[in-house]
Amino acid sequence: METKQFKAESKRLLDLMINSIYTHKEIFLRELISNSSDAMDKIYYKTLTEDSLKFERDDYYIKVVFDKENRVLKIADTGIGMTKEELENNLGVIAKSGSLQFKKENEVKEGYDIIGQFGVGFYSAFLVSDDVTVISKAFGSNEAYKWNSKGAEGYTIEPCEKEAYGTEIILKIKDNTEEENYDEFLDEYTLKSIIKKYSDFIRYPIKMDLTKTKPKEDNKEEFEEYKEEETINSMVPIWRKNKNELKAEDYENFYAEKHYGFDKPIKYIHTSVDGVVSYNAILFIPETTPYDFYTKEYEKGLELYSSGVLIMNKCGDLLPDYFGFVKGIVDSEDLSLNISREILQHDRQLKLIAKNIKTKIKNELESLLKKERDKYEKFYESFGRQLKYGVYSDFGSNKDILQDLLMFYSSKEKKMVTLAEYVSRMPEDQKYIYYAVGESNERIEKLPQIEGVLDKGYEVLYFTDDIDEFAIKMLMNYKEKEFKSVSSGDLGIEGEEKENTSSSDDKENKELFESMKDILSGKVKDVRASKRLKNHPVCLANEGELSIEMEKVLNAMPNNQNIKADKVLEININHDVFKPLKEAYEGDKEKLKLYTDLLYNQALLIEGLTINDPVEFTNNICKIMK
């Protein structure tokens, strides 16, 4: 028996494949099962092209057998098998694909899918074995052959006995090392799990003898083990079934089986696309957020299959971050994979799929908002913040996609409303979309700054998430209506009462306000008469793009730079406090400082900002009570 050498820079290339191409050792089982599936596909194709042949599906299956004691794992199939020449050409030449050659020779048309195209999948067996044997008998042949290799040094081929056509791959599993536990590939549960993970949707049965227990015949209280053959894989994936055959329960069961969440999905999306790139997908919109969703540990992505074989557990490139909550799978035969089937070679197809999926999710969410408002609001409660992050991120490049999905609490409706709904009922004289920022709806309703806008009869949107105002600043406008904070220096409201709108108030009290500004030097940019206050004595407004609420958010972040908004102290000259304030200016400068500090600190407290000196503040209160 002659030992032959591999025909492709044997040792170096084989070492490269074992050590570099495959990142997970368990992949070997996926590759060998995929090869077995290809072998049966080849017979199926022959029956389509040769009238004399018939294909009985029950005759075709894959059997996985393990022998823990002798450290042997066997993968057998009833596929087309290989002749001596094919064994030498396909297994003796690393990186030559018998499946690819079969496709070329038989001019395989579209719709007939063979998984293996690279000719290296078989060699993944050397990840877990240093003694690999292949026994094969070709379809229509009377001769069988045994191929054996112990690594890169070469291989042998010799005649052997085998009754039925097909192929058996026998692996002598390596001994454990300090770094690797090879025993797991001789464990029933592990093997079953790997098959379910990677090869669940191979279209032929993958069988194993599984350990069961039953009561002993002579003693029903004691149990004994026995073996029973079972089919491990599902074979027909749900996403390849006709949608009309499936019920909501089928999708919910699939969602649960995949451990996508403990709840039921709010929405499932089943789509099949044929075109430049063809794919099937089932997507789920969960009801509640995963516990780690808003943390760095959360990993977005869809399961990616190529021809029913799992390629990636979480393909993040298929989802934009703002739709990172979506769960599901994508299966395509058009992906350009590298030779390990683990990494995409070119991402053009993936980008096309991702673009289609993004549009599909957006359309489905808009449909949910329009037709099932209660469900959408439940979804938005869980994932609305992520949509707003999407508007803010990437310099607002996604705002046009997401703006119609946003919702905010309305002062008028006392419920969540969309921007479109807000704009549709704006009075003709209203120039801006008004919003107020606070920790809660209740806190916002008590803000002094909101009085003037509400008194005018305008609707105000309540922003209670840290991200809200940042997102709106990036959005800038909606349907040509700009956003305006109720805390802005200029509210842009026409027709205020004359005494409030006239600039004469500031002129009349110019010296008083200048004195107060000097007292608060470095704390406020200006002091002036308020045009917005009705019942409250004082408030803080801001000028410029950075609001007081944004200041609070930014300064709460790690490594903050003590960012400050430009603040303006506004005084309600019609409030009872203004008279003693003016009297103090005219006759008691110490009292003016006392009153000014009190009013400023009061405004800080209303905004939820920290008072610089709480002791001084309480002492000042005591002084005015004496």
Curated annotation (Swiss-Prot):
Family note: Belongs to the heat shock protein 90 family.
> What is this protein called in UniProt?
Chaperone protein HtpG
What organism does the UniProt record list as the source?
Clostridium botulinum (strain Loch Maree / Type A3)
- Nucleotidyltransferase keyword on record: no
Region of interest called C, as start-end residue ranges on this chain: 553-626
Q: Where is this region: A?
A: 1-341
Q: Where is this region: B?
A: 342-552
Q: Which residue ranges have biased composition labelled Basic and acidic residues?
A: 498-509
- Is DNA-binding given among the entry's keywords? no
Residue ranges for the region (Disordered) are: 490-509
* Membrane-crossing residue ranges in chain numbering: none
NCBIfam families documented for this protein: PRK05218.1 (NF003555)
Q: Which GO terms describe its cellular component?
A: cytoplasm
- Keyword terms: ATP-binding, Chaperone, Cytoplasm, Nucleotide-binding, Stress response
The record describes its quaternary structure and partners as:
Homodimer.
Q: Which gene encodes it?
A: htpG
Q: Name one GO molecular function term.
A: unfolded protein binding
Q: What PROSITE patterns would the database entry show?
A: HSP90
Which locations, inside or outside the cell, does it occupy? Cytoplasm
Q: What does this protein do?
A: Molecular chaperone. Has ATPase activity.
